[in-house]
């Protein structure tokens, strides 16, 4: 492993300007990420329970085709339903027993949509189709008959791809603002996952934060549920009320920053632009830590729906996040990690690992942190599943 630890790293807070975007939990692309990851979790847990292993699969290819509903005050029904198409590849049987793949996919997607978009009548207005295949040139790869057909369980897992993963910690104020403003509209449910606080507000909230020197310009797009409003005056009063509360929330969290808020609201049937034709796809939305931070390096790897046993873009996305946070907590200095791994290499021995911190740190202690997480080995798969690390989240309201 080529490991380099250097100091002199500066995060975007040192620049004279920043641009940070947050696509809310109800945004079509964020919905696609969430559905893909929910399927991956439910499929993996089903197979672990039934077979004791996770067979080969990847669900990181999902498309949402928006429906057709005409927006008007007082609400409206769908003329054409929303359609969700499951792609990717997966084992449809394991050890000669069938796996109810489409049932798992549909149930997981329905569960996810019900939490994020409670105003969406999934049963009547969403169609599901699975095009998930088991095509491959490898014998028994997607239909393992014995443990020998799952080499990652017999040996040290090998990387499935040549890829780069990037993470960093902590977030800048601009990045935190993007998450906490959307998070104002959410609370935690009994499973510690975000769920809407307000019945009349949808989930397709867009937040853009632009910092110019010490001035923060914030733009918020609010999706209103049309059936709860009779006219523009009601809508304006409702949004104005929340904007004032958001301002107070920001002032409570950040005592000495100068900011302004501009906003726009629009009508939806269920709370998302998938109501009127917009498409969603895995990997087109938020990046590391749930934001699109324009002055951060990032990778095109999309972890949502990827196999949590040996996919570089999943396992090392988790490890990069975890290690970056722990290094920051250990030394109280900003940290950035860039990891590169080659296909066929040992999964827990990256080809290159570059760790950058702002201040000098004890390199032996950093190495101890890295090795401890690497030595967790296959236990990282269980951690990814149990923590639901890649299920889209936000900084829920705690005011």
Curated annotation (Swiss-Prot):
InterPro entries: AdoMet_synthase_2 (IPR042543), AdoMet_synthase_2_family (IPR027790), AdoMet_synthase_3 (IPR042544)
A Pfam family: AdoMet_Synthase
Family per record: Belongs to the AdoMet synthetase 2 family.
Protein's recorded name: Uncharacterized protein SPy_0538/M5005_Spy0445
Source organism (scientific name): Streptococcus pyogenes serotype M1
